[in-house]
Amino acid sequence: MKLHKPLAVTMVAVVLGLPLLAQAEGDWKRGRVYYRMVCTACHVEKTGASIAPSTKTKAEWAAYMTADKHAKGKDSLKYYVSKKYRDSIKATNKAAEKYADVPEAELLEDVKAFVNHGAKDSDNPAGCS
């Protein structure tokens, strides 16, 4: 009898903790929207080419995100998910406007989750369209 109560408490804690664990890993679907509508749009406009998540492996994306270097080291990658950047483009970009109030760290985790989800060596290699 005494074993049932701790087991029940543990089960409730696990069930309640699952959404927090999923949130800590990022929302790849929201990351996909942001990546495609903000990152891809900018890359196509500035360089004439997009960078699909499937162009890199999970390890390559992790190294890129950890290095926090964008535009061959000229910029911080984090700037492109910052509220300052989103505010600067929200008049012409619906995703930047839609996610204007999302915390920067959360949005960065979403983008990380998307590129990891769509990486070359994932189960779902993803393009940009």
Regions found by a protein language model. Give the residues of each.
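Short microdomains enriched in Cys/His and/or Lys/Arg
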Residues: 20, 58-73
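Bacterial N-terminal signal peptides that target proteins for export
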Residues: 1-10
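The canonical Cys-X-X-Cys-His
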Residues: 35-46, 111
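Electrostatic cytochrome c docking/interface patches
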Residues: 18-34, 49-50
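Detector for the c-type heme attachment site
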Residues: 41-48, 66, 116
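Bacterial N-terminal signal peptides
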Residues: 10-18
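C-terminal capping alpha-helices of c-type cytochrome domains
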Residues: 86-129
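Short Fe-S-cluster ligation motifs
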Residues: 67-93, 99
